[in-house]
Design a protein with these regions (language model features):
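Glycosyltransferase catalytic domains, chiefly GT-A lineage
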Residues: 2-366
Length: 366
């Protein structure tokens, strides 16, 4: 594959630098020939799927933003993902799988022409455990960085995995009241198509809290928004996933959900961390949100269209119009068969790297 960077309206010096980027990309794509020839589940060859790394338009250094973007209708919308310290806290960022996954998500949302947003802010919420090197890399990648303090609990919590010990901090997204609505995404999310349309989903609208009995917890907010999807048991499912295929009906997966920030909602959630026995904590913030927004309670969560996201994606999902998936690029325990999907997931890691290698050549800090 060759990459040719042309423009008729830029100065010769800019043309020269873009040409250098193109040469770098040519070398990268040549080295990727071992996976480039595979057929993707969407019926495209990977050389077509990797078109984002063939720079057909000028790359621009990111500008640090201090104010939220005003979206159509005067609203302030955002994509937010949360990053905490992983097991590996060295500055070998290329081998930190969860950090790499976050960078892939940013690349999908900000830079890939086939998946990027049209003007919605992309924010990474970081807690104190995230190193300065990681923070600097995320800003260079184009993310808005939002630093928060840990959210602690006065009751004992029993997460299934040790690496989830700080994950209650993720609930601080509800304090980001500079935005009217937020799509919260786990870092191991990948996109096939743009996600902007999810903000128009019927389920993604603010609701009124229903009448309810007095509670020992903090007061419920008068309005709220929590909308998302449940997950299938594995990759043996239809597209879209049917109710009969859902592993735990009525149980929201907190890796992909829409919310309306609210200090009142945040204080209500935080009160669960101060009263023993109010929720199970195996899946931490996911269990807390499901208890607060249970379907038989005063703030039931709403379902989004299942085309927007799925766990354990399949070739059929790709072909039928799946928009995004919640799946690790390096490990897919519950995707059975569907080797093309697994190949596609792994290829995103290297496509992202090729794009950013060219991006870094621009010397944005100079």
């Amino acid at each position: 594959m060759a990459s040719l960077i042309t423009t008729h309206r830029v100065k010769a010096s800019i043309f020269a630098s873009c040409l250098a980027i193109g040469l770098l990309l040519t070398l990268f794509v040549s080295s990727a020939s071992s996976w480039r020839q595979a057929i993707t589940p969407a019926g495209l060859r990977l050389e077509q799927a990797t078109q984002a790394i063939v720079v057909s338009e000028p790359l621009h250094c990111p500008k640090n933003k201090t104010q939220p973007t005003v979206n159509p209708g005067g609203s302030h919308l955002a994509y937010v993902t949360w990053l905490s310290g992983t097991v590996d806290q060295t500055d070998d960022l290329e081998n930190d799988k969860y950090f790499v996954a976050t960078r892939i998500l940013l690349w999908h949302l900000l830079h890939n022409p086939s998946t990027r947003t049209q003007g919605i802010d992309v924010v990474v919420m970081v807690d104190p455990s995230v190193s300065e090197a990681r923070r600097a890399r995320l800003v260079r990648d184009g993310a808005i960085l939002h630093a928060v303090e840990f959210l602690t609990s006065s009751v004992a919590l029993h997460p299934e995995q040790e690496r989830w010990k700080n994950i209650m901090t993720k609930l601080r997204v509800f304090q980001m009241t500079q935005y009217s609505r937020i799509l919260m995404l786990d870092g191991d999310t990948m996109l096939l198509h743009p996600l902007d349309g999810v903000f128009d989903d019927p389920g993604a609208q603010i609701q009124h809290t229903q009448d309810h009995e007095p509670t020992t917890l903090a007061a419920l907010p008068p309005t709220y928004l929590l909308a998302g999807i449940s997950e299938p048991a594995d990759s043996h499912h239809s597209f879209p996933v049917t109710k009969a295929e859902i592993k735990d009906p009525g149980y929201l997966n907190a890796g992909f959900f829409m919310l309306a920030p609210s200090e009142a909602a945040f204080e209500h959630y935080r009160s669960y961390l101060q009263v023993p026995g109010t929720f199970r904590s195996t899946y931490m913030e996911q269990d807390l949100l499901n208890q607060a927004h249970r379907w038989d309670g005063p703030m039931p969560w709403k379902e989004l269209d299942y085309k927007w996201n799925v766990r354990y994606p399949t070739e059929n999902d790709f072909e039928k119009g799946l928009v995004s998936m919640h799946e690790k690029w390096w490990e897919q325990k519950y995707i059975y068969d569907n080797q093309k999907v697994k190949d596609w997931l792994q290829s995103r890691r290297w496509e992202m790297k090729g794009w950013y290698d060219a991006y870094d050549r621009m010397n944005c800090d100079a």
